[in-house]
Every structure is written in structure tokens, then in C-alpha cells.
Design a protein with these regions (language model features):
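Non-catalytic, usually N-terminal nucleic-acid engagement modules in DNA/RNA processing proteins
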Residues: 1-144
Length: 146
């Protein structure tokens, strides 16, 4: 599955992806939320029209990208992180992640998860899995409502 972080796969155009037989691309909720932004995607009526792609789109939750930032604060409600473009703080909740992926009109969406550094101890893994499960239930609830 080709990766199109911002919706566009680098170094290859969509005609070539079609010729190669790819039926889906992976895009990143976190990055698209920041640039070009939800307002742009919403005005254009979804990620498909923005990138002019007619096949499947899988969007991840953005959890790993937020985890990889040094300035993040993990809470039960979500993750507060410092935006690397502007320096402003943004709060990503499980519900917001799902809403964004619905705005993008993704075919396959992922729930927000807590990513932890490796190596780690069992206690940290246990806590991370339980938080991810808690968030997954919240994601499912909002997904089922929309």
C-alpha cells in the first residue's frame, strides 16, 4: 500500500499507481489536519476530490505522529501536542480523530492509539494497551453515531 502522507504519494502519480494495480493508499489524519487543514478538505468535499483519486483511502489516526513529537502530553481524554508548523498547542481526542477521518471520507479509518517507546517495562505496556482500548471504545461510539 503506497503511503501518501498528505494524500499525495511522492515520486509517482496516480495514473502510474493505477497501472501498477494499487487499489488503496494510506494517508495520515494528523498531517492532513495540519496541512492543508480540515477546512480545505471539507470545502472540497473530501480527500478524494482534493487529491483526485478514485480508489480506496485508508487514514490512520495520527497517534504515532503525535507520539513521535517531543512536546506532547498524554491524558485520558486525548493527547495535547505542540504543532510543529506554528508552535501552537492542539488537542487530539479519539472523537476528533474519527470526525476528521469521516470529513476526509476515508474508506478505512483507524482509532486513536497510545504509542509508547521501545524498550519499555510491562507496566507501561499494560497502561498503554488499556488506554488504547478505552480510546477505541470511544472511537467506535462516535463512528456508530455518524
Amino acid at each position: 500500500m503506497p503511503v501518501g502522507t498528505y494524500g499525495v504519494v511522492k515520486t509517482i502519480d496516480f495514473n502510474d499507481l493505477n497501472i501498477l494495480g494499487f487499489d488503496i493508499i494510506l494517508s495520515n489524519t494528523f498531517h492532513i489536519m495540519l496541512t492543508p487543514g480540515i477546512n480545505v478538505i471539507n470545502c472540497i468535499k473530501g480527500l478524494y476530490k482534493f487529491i483526485n483519486w478514485k480508489k480506496g483511502i485508508l487514514t490512520d489516526s495520527g497517534g504515532y505522529q503525535i507520539f513521535s513529537l517531543n512536546k506532547n502530553i498524554l491524558l485520558n481524554d486525548g493527547i495535547k501536542f505542540k504543532q510543529f508548523y506554528s508552535g501552537n498547542f492542539v488537542f487530539m481526542t479519539p472523537e476528533k480523530s474519527i470526525h476528521l477521518q469521516h470529513y476526509f471520507k476515508s474508506d478505512i479509518i483507524m482509532c486513536l492509539d497510545d504509542c509508547i517507546r521501545y524498550p519499555t517495562i510491562f507496566k507501561n505496556s499494560w497502561k498503554s494497551v488499556n488506554l488504547s482500548l478505552f480510546w477505541a471504545k470511544r472511537c467506535k461510539k462516535v463512528h456508530n453515531k455518524t
